[in-house]
């Protein structure tokens, strides 16, 4: 059974500010995430990558990545940003 998606308000704000084509790509990626997470043999194009204990990233669009936590009842999307912003986030440990 697919788990729920919970999205941090800051990630929602960032998503709303995107141009329409990027917003559509990101929303499609989010809609696929619960179904493909944990199924490594399904090619989804999301590029899910483990960043740490229970911490992952997936492709939102060509330039943007979602950082999310794998929680028991949900996938918590804590950040949306480009590659460099994700590197800074991880270096500073500012994810929830």
Q: Would you name each region that the model predicts?
A:
Residues 19-22, 41, 79:
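Flexible interhelical turns and helix-capping residues at alpha-helix boundaries
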Residues 27, 38-39, 93-96:
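Intrinsically disordered, low-complexity, repeat-rich regions
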Residues 2-4, 13-16, 56-96:
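Enriched for short, Lys/Arg-rich terminal
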Residues 32-59:
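A short, surface-exposed loop/turn module that caps and links secondary-structure elements
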Residues 5, 27, 42-45, 80:
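Non-catalytic, surface-exposed connector residues within folded enzymatic/regulatory domains
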Residues 1-31:
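Arg/Lys-rich, positively charged N-terminal/basic patches that mediate binding to nucleic acids
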